């Protein structure tokens, strides 16, 4: 891990002292070592019970602080702060909720929730992956391994969703409706990417570079508006190894 710049270290300590806070962690690309020189710093603020965003605003740092739940069910709020020349993203995490989702994942169960910024939605085991890959700075958080039951259950479910998406891609292609067709193709590709990652017992934190991590880079070029839509659907389905679901 790269050493924290002093302003980021100071902010982490301030967040850890807020009422309700139980831990502050370094997350994102800085934690996993995949960052660029210009990458932001991501801090996860884990709390139990409740957290008052006004306490974060009262720290006085320039930027935006959301309300709880304002960003969606998985990313349930946070802040974009500027500390001099350093950009910091703070993500609020209800540890009780995260641990409940983690317990479900241990039994191979999960939901896929609509989440801003995600094409296929975010699986409820995603926050467990954040715990597994983060770097704790203050306090303690669980550090789960990828559950074998999840590795057994998730791939089939994701591929089933891909098959349904390809069915609808075919329907949109038949109607020469390019935008929803492309959307369904992207949905199918990302679902198969999730399936592959689960088979490898690897956590997924978001959809950034997920297609490449899953070894599906070649599929990107198949979603091409210059070819006919039916041909694009057939090419993507073949590349994914998934047959579009037949409605009858």
Q: What is the role of each PLM region?
A:
Residues 14-15, 31-34, 178:
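Short, flexible, glycine/charge-rich loop motifs used to bind or transfer phosphoryl groups or to couple energy/partner
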Residues 9-13, 29-31, 75:
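A generic local structural motif
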Residues 61-173:
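Conserved NTP/Mg2+-binding pocket subregion across the NTase superfamily
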Residues 131-248:
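Conserved nucleotidyltransferase catalytic core and NTase-mimicking acidic/glycine-rich helix/loop elements
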């Amino acid at each position: 891990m790269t050493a924290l710049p002093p302003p980021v270290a100071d902010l982490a300590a301030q967040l850890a002292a807020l009422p309700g806070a139980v831990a502050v962690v370094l997350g994102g690309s800085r934690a996993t070592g995949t960052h660029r020189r210009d990458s932001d710093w991501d801090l996860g603020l884990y709390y139990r019970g409740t957290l008052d965003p006004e306490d974060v605003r009262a720290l006085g740092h320039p930027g935006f602080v959301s309300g709880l739940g304002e960003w969606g069910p998985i990313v349930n709020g946070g802040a974009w702060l500027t500390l001099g020349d350093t950009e910091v993203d703070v993500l609020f995490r209800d540890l009780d909720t995260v641990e409940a989702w983690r317990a479900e994942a241990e039994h191979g169960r999960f939901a896929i929730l609509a989440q801003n910024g995600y094409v296929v939605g975010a699986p409820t085991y995603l926050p467990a992956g954040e715990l597994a890959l983060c770097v704790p700075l203050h306090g303690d958080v669980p550090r789960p391994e990828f559950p074998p039951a999840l590795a057994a259950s998730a791939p089939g479910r994701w591929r089933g969703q891909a098959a349904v998406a390809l069915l609808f891609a075919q329907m949109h292609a038949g109607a020469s409706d390019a935008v929803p067709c492309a959307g369904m193709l992207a949905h199918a590709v990302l679902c198969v990417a999730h399936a592959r990652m689960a088979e490898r017992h690897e956590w997924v934190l978001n959809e950034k570079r997920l297609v490449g991590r899953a070894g599906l880079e070649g599929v990107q070029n198949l979603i091409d508006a210059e070819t006919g839509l039916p041909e694009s659907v057939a090419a993507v389905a073949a590349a994914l190894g998934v047959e579009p679901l037949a409605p009858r």
